Amino acid sequence: MKTLLLLRHAKSSWDEPSLRDFDRPLAPRGKRDAPRIGKALSERGPLPDLAISSPAARTRATIKAVMASARLEAELQVEESVYGASSAELMKLIRRLPGEKACVMIVGHNPGLEDLVARLTGETERMPTAALACVEFQIDRWKDIEDGEGKLVWLLTPKQLGHESEKE
């Protein structure tokens, strides 16, 4: 069995209009939500063996906060292709994952992540900022992953964790 954790970056800031999209930092709400999602992941599991992040500032800040609060010791890779990736591009990445990794987290962006959840599970789910989806596959090798064969085990959002994330 293989498990894929799909994490959308936490809420980013638009306060500095001169910044490129790639360089936008987390907003105060994002800085609160990312550790809360990490804590929930550590309580719920499964924990990833490998985390792959888009190189954008907001995704790197999100995964660092999630890993710290979850006390994850997973290998972290920054992958250029995740930034702005479509579901098809993410599928190519997933099919190349190392076979020994049973649980992998990808930290990225919409619409790619929402589209990927729908593609893998057949379920249309909204992925707001800092949402984390857990999808399981009855396969032994990542290269065997196919559309519609994943089971959405859970989808966690900051809103489900309470109203603290809505204060800004």
Residues covered by each model-derived region:
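Domain-level recognition of soluble alpha/beta enzyme cores
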Residues: 123-153, 158
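Short, flexible helix/strand-to-coil boundary loops that buttress conserved ligand/catalytic motifs
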Residues: 18, 117-121, 146
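Glycine-rich phosphate-binding loop signature in dinucleotide/nucleotide-binding domains
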Residues: 44-46, 97-102
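Active-site catalytic microenvironments for nucleophilic, acid-base chemistry
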Residues: 40, 65, 69, 96, ...
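Active-site-proximal alpha-helix that buttresses catalytic centers in soluble enzyme cores
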Residues: 2-3, 7-81, 85, 89, ...
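A glycine-rich beta-strand to alpha-helix segment
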Residues: 101-119
